[in-house]
Regions:
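Non-catalytic beta/alpha edge segments that cap or flank active sites
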Residues: 1-194
Length: 194
């Protein structure tokens, strides 16, 4: 199960339509070959609400992966990273570093992004939680990575590492569509595709 959380004061109050959750659902539908279902939440940019939502998705709903979108900039109301770190048992800094590296190919303000990724563990379950950018185009770019004019991957997106991370924390074996994003696993962890 995948938790999808869009964090936006204005979208959560109906000022405008949320684009984060639909973008994540569309991308996952094209990228995942394994069966999956989503638990979605559209919430305000408020640290206690974000932390409570992440905790509920992992501890109660049993999500193995939670993707958030929004609330990662430097504005005073942007508290997604702090709320995510508050529920973490382990930090996974490489995900945020790679997202900023990918986004810097497009905009110099990517350096202002504060996305984090963490593991949340309970006695019998663990999940990977990743903060993604707020814009659908940036979500796709950071998940897929960069390609040259011929469509060959030049910079891997962060999702290439997600299936193996889920393996390592005891979650289900996730298969991806290599045309969208090729999951990387060491040979010893690979299975024959179904």
């Amino acid at each position: 199960m995948v938790g999808l959380v869009s964090i936006s004061d204005r979208a959560s109050t109906g000022v405008y339509e949320d684009k984060g959750i639909p973008a994540l659902q569309e991308w996952l539908a094209g990228a995942l070959r394994s069966p999956w279902r989503a638990e979605t939440r559209l919430i305000q940019d408020d640290a206690p609400t974000i932390s409570a939502t992440l905790t509920e998705l992992v501890d109660v709903a049993g999500c193995d992966l939670v993707l958030t979108t929004g609330g990662t900039g430097p504005a005073r109301r942007d508290v997604t990273p702090e709320a995510t770190l508050a529920v973490a048992t382990k930090e996974m800094p490489g995900f945020g570093e790679q997202m900023r590296q990918i986004s810097l190919n497009f905009v110099p303000t990517a350096i202002l992004s504060r996305q984090v990724a963490v593991i949340r563990e309970t006695a019998d379950h663990a999940a990977l939680i990743i903060n993604l950018p707020g814009q659908p185009k940036s979500i796709r770019e950071t998940l897929e990575g960069l390609r040259d004019a011929d469509g060959k991957s030049t910079v891997p997106g962060i999702f290439a590492a997600v299936p193996y991370c889920i393996d390592l924390i005891g979650g289900p074996y996730i298969e991806t569509d290599a045309a969208v994003v090729a999951a990387f696993r060491p040979k010893s962890a690979q299975r024959t595709p179904r």
